[in-house]
Amino acid sequence: MIKQAIIPLAGLGTRLLPLTSVIPKELLPINGKPNVEYILDECIDAGINQFIFIISKNKQNIKKYFFNDKFYKKIIKKKSDQRIINEFKKIKKYQKMIKFVYQNEPKGTGDAVLKCKKLIQGNFFMMLLPDDLIIKNNCTKEMISLYNKKKSSIIATKTINKNDVSRCCLLYTSDAADEEDS
């Protein structure tokens, strides 16, 4: 059973500069909620309850976002706003599930995942790249279900336009594999 997720967050975020020189892209709000929270909520809904965040020294704001109890308590004390109280409760729930690993030099995704080796329990985990947000269905739940059927590694992919090829990783598949899982 898959209960852990690795989430690499140490990237430089250069495509969104200059905004990401101030705010990590993972904390950029989408409809009032940081991107990384969408990932956490989807994973929790899929049964994952342990997260390993890979960050760099330049991404301390991510750690601060989730572990800034003193700030929340100070605000709640001054202003008894139910929305803020609810946010704090949600953050406290996340705190129990998150561990941090540092990747101080950008040596790629493989290096980042290798840094998590000591924290991985068992042989199975999810790795979620926070660059693309999939709103439609719970992709994590679907991937776990497919993994349980196939008992092999699963990769979520999407078809892209030729104009976007330079910004993406390419994956070539055989026709037989395409037909099997369509």
Predicted regions and their residues:
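N-terminal glycine-rich phosphate-binding loop and ensuing alpha1 helix
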Residues: 2-77, 103, 139-140, 145
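Single, functionally critical "micro-switch" positions that shape active/binding sites
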Residues: 10, 130, 177
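Conserved hydrophobic/aromatic positions in well-ordered beta-strands
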Residues: 28, 169-171
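Conserved beta-loop-beta/alpha segment of the NTase-like Rossmann-fold superfamily
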Residues: 64, 72-75, 82-169
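Single conserved hydrophobic/aromatic residue that forms the stacking wall/gate
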Residues: 172-182
